[in-house]
A protein has these predicted regions:
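Small-residue-enriched, tightly packed secondary-structure blocks
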Residues: 1-144
């Protein structure tokens, strides 16, 4: 009940602000930070016209951010002209407050394309940071 309600409220907030996406990514990720942080994840990009495509993401962050988390992730993708356009960097500001579990939503952008990660995670993390996610067709350890 509470988990479903929390997720529904986060998705509703995204739809009311940005409308209906033309793609979405379902996946999982792990992240950790002690002032400087790293995030790694993988999933599948789904679009109405082009089907599914495997994607990986990684990225650095810096800020007043401490702890670690593992999360199931749904990313709403807006204004994606082609599936290959996802393979670039998307910058944004993120804030997290996890104590055992929680939800989070942020918005990342590059030009007209907006990616809205919605995370449901477990861990212990508190803080705010600025950073980016880099989407790639293959997994890599290099977040830059």
């Amino acid at each position: 009940g509470t988990v479903s309600r929390g997720l529904a409220q986060v998705v509703e907030a995204a739809f009311s602000r940005w409308g209906q996406p033309n793609g979405y990514i379902l996946g999982q990720e792990a992240s950790g930070a002690f002032i400087v942080g790293l995030r790694y994840g993988d999933g599948k990009l789904y679009t109405k016209n082009a089907g599914a495509r495997r994607v990986f993401w990684e990225g650095p962050s810096v800020g007043f951010d401490y702890g670690g988390e593992g999360a199931r992730t749904m990313m709403l993708v807006y204004n994606l002209p082609a599936t290959s356009a996802i393979y670039q960097r998307f910058a944004g500001i993120d804030g997290s407050a996890y104590f055992i579990g929680g939800f989070g939503m942020t918005a990342l952008g590059n030009g007209n394309i907006i990616v809205v990660p919605i995370r449901s995670g477990v861990g212990l993390r508190l803080g705010a940071n600025i950073g980016y996610l880099k989407f790639t067709p293959q997994a890599t350890w290099n977040p830059f």
